Amino acid sequence: MSDITRLMSPCEIPLANAARHENSIMYVDLNSCFATIEQQARPMLRGRPVAITNRITKNACIVAASYEAKALGIKVGMRRMEAEAICPDLIFAETEPAKFIYVHQKLRRIMQDYSSDVIMKSIDEGIIDLTKRPLDQASRSPLDIGAEIKQRLRTEIGCHMRCNVGIASNRFLAKTAAELHKPDGMDEITSANQRQIFASLKLMDLPGINTRMQTRLNAVNIFTPTDLINAKESTLVKLVCKSIDGSKWYRRLRGIEVDDTVSDIKSIGRQYVLESCHLSKQELEARILHLAEDLGHRLRSQNLYARGLFVWIGTHSDLYLHQNYLTRSAFHTNSDIMTHARQLFTKLPLHSARIIGITLYKIQPFADAQLYLDQPKRDREEQLCAAEDKINRRFGERTIYSADSFDTSQIKTKIPFGSTRFLDIL
C-alpha cells in the first residue's frame, strides 16, 4: 500500500463554505490508464516502456504512455518516429476500447459502493461525494475508504492496477491532492495544510492553469500558488480573468464548490491519420464518410442537432487547411453530414493529406430543431437513421452502415477523452 500523506501546518486559509465538510469530496484517478491496462492484460509488458496509439503507423500519435516511458521523456502527443528516436526499445500497442470500457465500468461500480453521488469525469477519473455515503460507510474516514478503493482496484480488476486518490472540500482541491504523489498516492488537502502544500507547488501544477493563464497571473505579480491564494478577489476578476471566472477561482481556492455544473456539448469531432499517402480518391472519400457516420451516431445518441460542420486536413509538411459550413437549418442525419463533408473536402488538397478531421459545432437540443419544407423526406431519413442506430446498439457498431463507407475497417473506435457521454454507444 502506498504512503498516505497528510501534511499539517499552523497556517490556515479560512474556508468560506463552512457548511461543507473539509473532506467531503474524493477524486479517483487511474495511473497512465490505457498503458497500465495494457500492462495488466499483458504481464510481459510490465516494467517496460509502453506507448499506446490508435493505430501503429509511421505517423501515429501517442495517446498514452506508461510510467516507464514517461520517465524516459515520452509524452502524449508525440509521433511514433519522434518517440522511437528517444527510446528505440519503446513498445507500441494499439488501443482496445473493450478493455478500457471494462475497467471503467468496474471502477465506477466500486466507487458507487461508497456514495449515491458518483460522477465519472472521464474514462479514468471519477468523483465521489462522501456526504452521500450509505449508512454502512457513514462512520468511516475518507482516508480509510480511499485505501479500500485502492486495494479493491488491485483485487477486483488486476494486481498491476494503481490509482491516485485526492480528498478535499471541493473538486478542484481534491484533484490537486490526487496529483501530488503519482503514481499510487493518496493525499488530503484541508484548511490546516493547504498553504504548506501549495508552497511546494508551481502555478502550472494546479488543475486548470496552463501557459496562457500563468502569463496573465504573472502580469499582476502572481508567480506561485501561495501568491494566488493571497490575491484579492477583485484582482482575479478585473485583471486576470476579466470576468466572473476570477470570482470562481477565488472561491475554488477556498474550498467552495464551483465546478459541479454539467456543461453542454459545444462540438463533436473525429480525426484519422491516413495509413498511406497513395490512397485513391474513392478510398479517401470512404474514410471521410466513415467519420461522418460515426459523428452522426454520437450526435443522435444525445438527441442533438448541429448547425455547423468544420473539416480540416494536415499535410505531410505540417500545413493545416480547413473549410467550414454554417446553416440556419439544424441537421443530424448521416445523409446531411455526409453531403456537407463531401462538399467541403472537395475544396481541400486531399492528395497531400496526412490526417483528416471533421467537427460538428453549433450544437443544439432536439427540441430547438426547426421543421423543413420537405419534412416528409426528412422524416424518412430520421426513421432510417433511428433504425440503423438501434441495430448498431444491439449488435455492435457498424453492423449496418452506408455502402459509401465500405472497406474502412482500419478506422478503429476511439475512446473520447474528457467525457463519458458516448461510452454507452461504443
Give short role names for the model-derived ranges.
Residues 335-394:
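C-terminal hydrophobic structural anchor segments
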Residues 159-161, 305, 352, 367:
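Short loop/turn segments at connectors of secondary-structure elements within structured domains
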Residues 167-171, 252-253, 305-316, 354-364, ...:
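A glycine-rich phosphate-binding loop feature that marks nucleotide/adenosyl-phosphate handling sites
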Residues 14-18, 27, 213-353, 425:
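DNA-contacting surface of Y-family translesion DNA polymerases
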Residues 88, 268-273, 368-369:
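A short, surface-exposed helix-loop junction/capping segment
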Residues 127-132, 321-327, 367-374, 415:
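Short, hydrophobic beta-strand segments
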Residues 1-251, 257-259, 297, 378-426:
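Gly/Gly-Pro- and Ser/Thr-rich, intrinsically disordered tail segments characteristic of DNA damage-repair
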